[in-house]
């Protein structure tokens, strides 16, 4: 969200609801609980003396302050471990960790003392500690609140396979840099995030009949002398790859994208729209972890046929660009503005937003282009 919309919500949070009369201390407590992670010692008195409206206005309109003390504390958590180029090592440890847990569950492994490693378990534990440090120590409380808000809005389940290793990067490299920016940019970033694409199975969503290049090469007839052993090994590898490869469209991400991330459950879309969105997003995948992960578009997997979403036509042959056009359509749809604005009002103003709050937020969204 641009700060214009947040400013409106912040001022609403600092103002008593109609028919209510709050003391200066109560107003200060309310705004600190909404725009920050609660009051620090002595802060209720200082905000009450300044005035909750004035404090909220300054918080939302001033430039984001440098925070050297927080930066010093963050450095203790080795931020590099949350970046993409450190992912291959974490994923290898995740694979070993998964094998150990599977063996333990099946009774095959002897009981062993916990191992302190740099794997996903330790990374997640440190990442959770870092979140607490930021929430309690950051001068820019609004950014931390928005990171928390968007992390919940664009939920990723950390106990699904690779997402144990991908989640920290998702929050640090996808959510955090865009937490105070335009919604369209954030929606696109999450749509291209390996954590999201893996969690909701879009990495396995391909057009019907699609054959990945590595499988196509193995399926080609070979000429020349071929030892029997090599031929058997090749056939075995081909069979394993064919068994693991996706075979068609997966609608999981398409449905969540519309129902939770943008339009809302009552956003006016149909099952046909879900299928068409899934077709548009075929080929949106991720690089292999041993190559550093990151978004990767697979043209071989994309459905190049014509599609229609919410009455809008997407001509045949649109490729990756039609996915970006889809995100733009969803991000700026009136239903999305209403759905996301209601959630923002519930977070920043009141659990049950007062009359007019959502409509005011939508108008601010329109005025600032999200």
Language-model region placement:
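Bacterial N-terminal signal peptides
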Residues: 2-13
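Sec/Tat signal peptide C-region and signal peptidase I cleavage site
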Residues: 15-19
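Mature N-terminal segment immediately following signal peptide/propeptide cleavage
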Residues: 20-48
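Structural motif
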Residues: 20-27, 137-142, 248, 268-269, ...
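Short, hydrophobic/amphipathic alpha-helical patches that form generic packing surfaces
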Residues: 30-39, 134, 152, 259-263, ...
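Conserved catalytic core of Hanks-type protein kinase domains
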Residues: 34, 59, 189-190
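N-terminal accessory alpha/beta regions
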Residues: 41-153, 158-169, 173-178, 199-203, ...
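Active-site substrate-binding loop specific to GH73 endo-beta-N-acetylglucosaminidase modules
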Residues: 127-128, 163-370
């Amino acid at each position: 969200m641009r700060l214009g919309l947040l400013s409106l919500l912040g001022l609403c949070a600092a103002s008593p609801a109609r028919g209510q009369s709050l003391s200066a201390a109560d107003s200060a407590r309310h705004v600190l609980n909404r725009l920050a992670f609660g009051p620090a010692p002595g802060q209720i008195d200082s905000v009450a003396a300044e005035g909750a409206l004035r404090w909220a206005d300054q918080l939302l309109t001033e430039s984001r302050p440098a925070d050297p003390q927080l930066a010093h504390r963050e450095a203790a958590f080795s931020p590099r471990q949350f970046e993409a180029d450190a992912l291959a090592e974490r994923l290898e440890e995740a694979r070993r960790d998964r094998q150990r847990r599977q063996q333990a569950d099946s009774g095959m492994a002897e009981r062993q003392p916990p191992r302190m490693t740099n794997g996903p378990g330790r990374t997640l534990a440190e990442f959770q500690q870092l979140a607490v440090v930021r929430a309690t120590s950051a001068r820019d409380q609004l950014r931390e609140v928005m990171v928390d808000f968007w992390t919940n809005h664009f939920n990723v389940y950390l106990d699904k396979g690779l997402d144990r290793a991908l989640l920290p990067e998702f929050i640090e490299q996808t959510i955090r840099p865009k937490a105070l920016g335009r919604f369209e940019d954030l929606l696109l970033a999450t749509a291209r995030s390996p954590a999201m694409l893996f969690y909701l199975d879009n990495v396995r969503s391909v057009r019907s009949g699609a054959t990945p290049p590595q499988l196509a090469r193995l399926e080609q007839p070979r000429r020349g002398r071929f030892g029997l052993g090599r031929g058997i090994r090749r056939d075995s590898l081909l069979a394993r790859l064919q068994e693991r490869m996706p075979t068609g469209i997966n609608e999981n991400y398409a449905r969540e994208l519309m129902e939770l991330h943008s339009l809302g459950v009552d956003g006016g879309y149909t099952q046909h729209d879900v299928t068409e969105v899934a077709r548009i997003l075929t080929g949106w995948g991720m690089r292999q972890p041993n190559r550093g992960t990151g978004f990767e578009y697979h043209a071989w997997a994309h459905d190049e046929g014509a599609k229609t979403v919410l009455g809008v036509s997407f001509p045949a042959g649109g490729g990756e660009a039609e996915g970006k056009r889809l995100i733009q359509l969803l991000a700026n749809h009136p239903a999305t503005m209403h759905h996301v604005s209601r959630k923002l009002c519930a977070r920043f103003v009141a659990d049950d937003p007062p009359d007019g709050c959502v409509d005011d937020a939508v108008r601010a969204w329109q005025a600032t282009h999200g």
